[in-house]
Amino acid sequence: MLTKCEGIVLRTNDYGETNKIVTLLTREHGKIGVMARGARKSASRLSAVSQPFLYGSFLMQRTSGLGTLQQGEMILSMRTIREDLFLTAYAAFIAELTDKGTEEKKPNPYLFELILESFKRLNDGTDPDVITFIVQMKMLGVMGLYPELNHCVHCKSGEGTFHFSIRDNGFICHRCFEKDPYRVPMSPQTARLLRLFYYFDIGRLGSVSLKQETKNEIKRVIDLYYEEYSGLYLKSKRFLDQMESMKNLLDENKS
């Protein structure tokens, strides 16, 4: 059956000498894989529309297994991302997290809009750390993970100083600190931002400027939580961490 839909290219894998298997995130059908015959040839009409992170309109032959991509039309190329090594690292991480954190053929229009908006924001110059934090927090619910971010996991108080208890799955207040000696310290601002990123509509995001210290705290909480609960190993995460270390080193040398 021929189907036309909009999609985001999450991943491509070479298949044979001339073909690609393209993994698309679509609004109507969720995550699907399609064979793009001849897409490895530079002159192929499918080559341009099977680039990572591209947002396009696709005509495909759908089957119960791997579909076949017939044609495509670019809507947004996300060219700025692909031409910047640092932005590519962030986008590749978001794409792999989306790919490995979702099941095939399970439509989720909310997730589609989240990933599309995150790539648009990366392409337009929004702080990539902030975009990545938002996607990571919102992907938790997609994967069935629901940390308690509104009050203390023990006494249920919504007031006080909060740290994060990885073991107990959420915020822990100063009155209950002794119940988890391995809790992760964080500032009140970090606690507010974790909650904000979890609930906030990324489409409403304005200009955000975070201190590196705050970013480091957020990153530590999210990384530890994913390590404990997600069950995911993402190759792109290691690459992104290496790129961030390189960027921080370059920034230090400039100053």
From Swiss-Prot:
It holds the Pfam family RecO_N. Involved in DNA repair and RecF pathway recombination. GO terms for cellular component: bacterial nucleoid. The keyword Chaperone does not apply. The gene is recO. GO terms for biological process: DNA recombination; double-strand break repair. PANTHER family: DNA REPAIR PROTEIN RECO. Belongs to the RecO family. This is DNA repair protein RecO. Keywords: DNA damage, DNA recombination, DNA repair.
